[in-house]
Amino acid sequence: MNILDYYEVVTSKIFKLESMNEGLVLIAPEQEVDGVRSLMVGLYVPEHERYKMYTFRSSMNEGELGDKYKAMVGTMDVLKPDWDRISKKRRKRV
C-alpha cells in the first residue's frame, strides 16, 4: 500500500469516528498546500472544555500516520467514559 492509499484508509476511519460521536470529534475540511493534503481532527476533552488537535498529512510515512492514529485512538479510549456521560445528558434533554 502506498502512502496516499494509507492516508485514505486513516482518514476514512476518522470520518467514521466523527459520525459515531456527535460533536465530540470535529474534523476540519481537508486542505492541500503544495501537493500535501492535511486533515485536522479535534477530540473534545471535557475536563479542559476544549479540543485536543491531531493533524494528519499525506506527506507523513506509514509509521508516522499509524503512530498518530494510535495516539488519537488512545486518547479517545481515555475520553470515552466522559463522552458517554455527555451523550446521556444530551439524550435526557430531548
Report residues per predicted region:
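Negatively charged, low-complexity tracts enriched in Asp/Glu with abundant Ser/Thr
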Residues: M1-L24
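Mixed-charge, Lys/Arg-enriched low-complexity segments
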Residues: S59-V94
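N-terminal compositionally biased, intrinsically disordered segments and leader/signal-like regions
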Residues: S12-K13, F56, M76
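Generic short amphipathic/hydrophobic targeting helices enriched at N-termini
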Residues: D5-Y6, V10, P29, G74, ...
